[in-house]
C-alpha cells in the first residue's frame, strides 16, 4: 500500500483476517450474467472454506456477501465511511446481517466519518491488501473494480477475471485486465489451484429462465428483456406500448421474480437454478 493505515476500525469477527481471503469486486449496475457469476463463485469459494471480502456496494459486492452467508461461509466488508454512515443506505440491513453471521466489517475511518467519494480508492486498496487475490466479475473500463485490480497488481497479489461479452460495456474493464495479465477463470478450481487447494467442491449449476410460467398478457414485454440490462424506453418502443402499460407489466413481472430492476430504470431477466 502507498501508506499503512494509522487506524483500522473493526466490528465483528476480526479473526477472519487470518483465513484465506479472496476479494470479489465488480459493477454496481451488473448484468444478469454478472449476477450469476458472482453468486456462483462466491458460493463455491465459501463452500471450500474461503472467506469473501468486498466493499458492501450494491451489485456484485452485495451478491458476493450474501452468497457467502447463504452457504455457511464468512464474509468481510470494507467501508469507505464510518460505521455510523453506512453507504449505500439500503445496505444497512446487509451490514447488520454480516455481523449477525459472525462476519467482520472494517473501516479506516472513525464511526462518525461521512461518505466521501475520495475515500473509495483507499477502501479498494485495503480490500486488495487484505486478500490473497482479487476476482473481478464484471467491470467497466475506468471503474472502481479495475482500480482495485490494478492496485492488486502493484501489491503483488493474484488478479483473476471472468471474461465478458466483447460487445458489453459492462465487461470492457474485465477483458482489458485479462489482456494485462489477469488470470482468466471459468470455474472455482482455477482460483483454488493458485491457493494450492487441488481438492475442491465445485458448484456446477444449470441456469434457465422461468418463461413457461409467465402469464400470457406479460409475455410480450418479458420476451423483450434479456440477460443484459435494457431501459424502459427501449422496452416501450419495442413493445409498441405506452410507458404506463409497460410500467405496470414490469412491476408485476418483478413482484413475481421473473425480472429484476436495476438502477436507472434498467431491467434484466432473473435466472433460476
Residue ranges, per PLM feature:
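Glycine-biased, small-residue-rich flexible motifs in mid-sequence functional cores and linkers
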Residues: 1-273
